[in-house]
Amino acid sequence: MTQTMKHLFPILLLLAPLFAGAQGADSAAFIRPPYLQPGDTVGIVSPAGKLPLKTDTAKIRERIESWGLHVKFGAHCADREQPYFAGTDAERAADLQRMLDDPSVKAVIAFRGGYGSVRLLPLVDLARLREHPKWVVGFSDITMLHLALRKLRIESIHGPMPAGFHFDGKEDPSAESLRQALFGETVCIEVEPHPLNQPGTASGRLAGGNLTVIRSADGTPEELTAEEPTVLLIEEVGEFVYRIDRMMQSLARSGKLENLRAVVVGHFSEMLGMEKFGVADACAVISAYTRPLGIPVVFGFPAGHTDPNLAVYLGRRVTVGVDDTGARVEFARED
């Protein structure tokens, strides 16, 4: 070591924490895709299950165009040749990658969930979105894509998908919430009081989605972790209640609940085996794990397999407030 370096070494040691802090701050930032503007184009793909026969793509196009947007459908989004999936893995991955790479497409919306998104992860390059970010939208099985985007620190939208839009002449608050999220209008969602709510106020980045998909990602590159202040969103459909308990046990035993700042519990719809398990609903099972945490918990949040299913920004800093009058989830305007 030269004499100059010997003199500089103590100074560098003193400055090291400052550089580390600056690096940590930069790495903590999430990339926020640009909000949509009238005249923009959205791409619709089917990364998982094939569409129901009753799906009316013409009405879906008309609905989205009424928002002032243009629509591109993936080449295989309506394929029905496979027993379950909307095309082969290669076809679905190619559709998704084309929409991700198309500079004219400002948001990529999953047509529906089901199962199959995880099969595309080895075949697509989501990292390109760090250079040219755009919104990825969906819920349920699409949670796997959200988890992958979280690892890349890119915000995404957990929300309704076109296959679930209503065309019965009545208002469709789910679809309207998606429009609001795409155009950057979602600021705060208020929820009615729930007997299992836990009071308090806390902030963190919103993460999560479908509970089964979250647990299935354990041990993979997409595994959900909470090293930073995190607000966990969970929802589920069609599961036996004992499996909900098993998954909550796994979250607790793996330490994934320890660093949470708040929990937002969406709808647990069409639950099975409740009488046999001795509970009135899945919320009672979840509450047994969240209550000892001593953090704000919101039950009955309108997200998941429910109507309305409101769109929320994953990766966004949120503030959760819960009291006797209800609950509020506020989305930060700046990162």
Where are these regions (language model features)?
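Positively charged n-region of N-terminal signal peptides that target proteins for export
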Residues: 1-8
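Hydrophobic h-region of N-terminal signal peptides that target proteins for export
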Residues: 14-21
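ATP/NTP phosphate-donor binding region
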Residues: 23-104
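Conserved beta-alpha junction segments in alpha/beta enzyme cores
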Residues: 41, 51, 55-59, 63, ...
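Short, acidic/small-residue loops that bind anionic groups at enzyme active sites
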Residues: 124-148, 155-161, 296
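Conserved anion/nucleotide-ligand pocket segment
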Residues: 155-219
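Internal helical hairpin/lid segments
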Residues: 224-282
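ATP/nucleoside-binding phosphotransfer catalytic cores, i.e., glycine-rich phosphate-binding loops
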Residues: 267-335
